[in-house]
C-alpha cells in the first residue's frame, strides 16, 4: 500500500500544481485585459483634447442625422444656372413660330454641319494601268457618291429647323431615315440601269 499511497500523493501534487498554475494564469490574464483597456482610454483622450457634452450626442447618430443640427448659410441661388426640362412641343407649333424665336431656341454646343468643305483629303495616287472597264466602274461609283452629296446639300435652310425637331420624336426620325434609304436605293437602281 505504500507504493499505492505514493502514487496518490504524486497525482494530487500534480493536480494541485496544475490548478495553482491555471489560477495564476487567469489572474494575470484579467490584470492584462484591465491594463490594456486603461491604456486605450488614455490614448484616445490626450491631455489637450476634452470632448464637449454636445459631441457625444452627435457621435451617436450618423452623419446625415447631424446635418439637421448645423445652421445653414443663406445660399445665393442666382449663381447657379437653372436646369429645366425642355417642354414637349409638336413640330407644327414650331413651324408656325416666327424666325426670331427659332434662333433663340437653337442653342448648339457642337456643330452638326456635315458639309465636305472643311474636310480636305490628300488625293489618291492614280494607277495608270487601269483598264477601260475599271475606269468606267470608278466613274460610275464617283457619280453615285456625287449624287448622294448633292442630295444632302440640296436641303433648303428652312428644313433644318424641321429636321432638328424630328429628333424629338423617334418614330418620325426612324420613318424619315427609312424613307431616305429607300429613295437612295431606288436612285442607285435607276442609275445602274
Swiss-Prot record:
Residues 116-166 are annotated as: Disordered. The keyword Disulfide bond applies. InterPro entries: T-cell_rcpt-assoc_TM_adapter-1 (IPR020399). It is a single-pass type III membrane protein. Stabilizes the TCR (T-cell antigen receptor)/CD3 complex at the surface of T-cells. Homodimer; disulfide-linked. Interacts with CD3Z. When phosphorylated, interacts with PIK3R1. This is T-cell receptor-associated transmembrane adapter 1.
Amino acid at each position: 500500500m505504500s507504493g499505492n499511497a505514493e502514487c496518490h500523493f504524486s497525482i494530487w501534487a500534480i493536480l494541485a500544481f496544475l490548478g495553482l498554475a491555471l489560477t495564476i494564469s487567469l489572474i494575470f490574464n484579467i490584470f492584462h485585459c484591465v491594463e490594456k483597456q486603461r491604456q486605450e482610454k488614455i490614448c484616445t483622450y490626450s491631455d489637450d483634447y476634452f470632448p464637449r457634452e454636445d459631441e457625444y450626442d452627435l457621435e451617436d447618430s450618423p452623419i446625415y442625422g447631424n446635418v439637421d443640427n448645423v445652421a445653414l448659410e443663406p445660399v445665393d441661388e442666382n449663381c447657379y444656372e437653372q436646369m429645366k426640362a425642355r417642354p414637349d412641343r409638336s413640330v407644327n407649333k414650331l413651324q408656325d413660330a416666327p424666325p426670331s424665336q427659332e434662333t433663340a431656341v437653337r442653342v448648339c454646343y457642337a456643330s452638326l454641319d456635315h458639309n465636305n468643305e472643311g474636310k480636305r483629303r490628300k488625293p489618291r495616287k492614280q494607277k495608270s494601268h487601269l483598264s477601260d472597264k475599271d475606269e468606267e466602274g470608278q466613274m460610275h461609283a464617283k457619280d453615285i457618291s456625287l449624287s448622294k452629296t448633292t442630295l444632302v446639300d440640296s436641303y433648303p435652310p428652312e428644313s433644318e429647323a424641321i429636321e432638328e425637331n424630328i429628333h424629338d420624336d423617334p418614330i418620325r426620325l426612324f420613318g424619315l431615315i427609312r424613307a431616305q434609304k429607300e429613295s437612295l436605293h431606288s436612285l442607285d437602281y435607276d442609275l445602274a440601269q
